[in-house]
From Swiss-Prot:
Keyword flag Transcription: yes
Subunit-structure text: Forms oligomers.
Protein name per Swiss-Prot or TrEMBL: Transcriptional regulator MraZ
Gene behind the chain: mraZ
Source organism (scientific name): Oleidesulfovibrio alaskensis (strain ATCC BAA-1058 / DSM 17464 / G20)
Gene Ontology process terms (BP): negative regulation of DNA-templated transcription initiation
Location in the cell: Cytoplasm, Nucleoid
Length: 149
């Protein structure tokens, strides 16, 4: 499964987010309840399938004697996770804490990131993607990624 593209949505007054059909169907395909692990990072919410979240969390368990900064990072990411299920209407309810962290009020954008997807406030995402990414092509090339645009 691969999450791709952007989908612009609005929360309802109760903080529920209607997932795009392709996202909803992908979640229901891997979990009958449409479970998703939603955590905080980079000023947005990051959603993982149950299997991918278990792998991610297991990676932290393998770190022996983590630094204070790593433990603080773990507190942010693992401590910020909430397990959600897609309701019968294809929605997930965002918590107040998650909405505050990501600056979400009403308008959101769901952004595919391959094995996971992100939920951004529309304003925050516009600021992020409005950056100059000219130097990123050098970083891609140094990593062996050909990006011929």
């Amino acid at each position: 499964m691969s999450f791709k593209g952007r989908s612009y949505r609005s929360l309802d007054p109760k903080g529920r987010l209607m997932l795009p059909p392709e996202v909803r169907d992908a979640l229901l395909a891997v979990s009958p309840e449409g479970r998703v692990s939603l955590t905080t990072f980079d000023g947005c919410l990051v959603a993982y399938t149950p299997e991918d979240w278990e792998k991610f969390e297991a990676g932290f368990a393998r770190i022996k004697n983590p630094s204070r900064k790593m433990r603080d990072f773990r507190r942010l990411v693992i401590g910020g996770v909430e397990e959600l299920c897609v309701d019968k209407q294809g929605r997930v309810k965002l918590s107040r804490a998650h909405m505050e962290y990501a600056g979400i009020t009403k308008k959101v954008v769901i952004v595919g990131q391959g094995s996971r997807f992100e939920i951004w406030s529309e304003e925050e995402l516009e600021a992020v993607i409005g950056q100059d990414f000219g130097d990123v092509t050098d970083e891609l090339a140094e990593s062996g990624v050909d990006f011929p645009i």
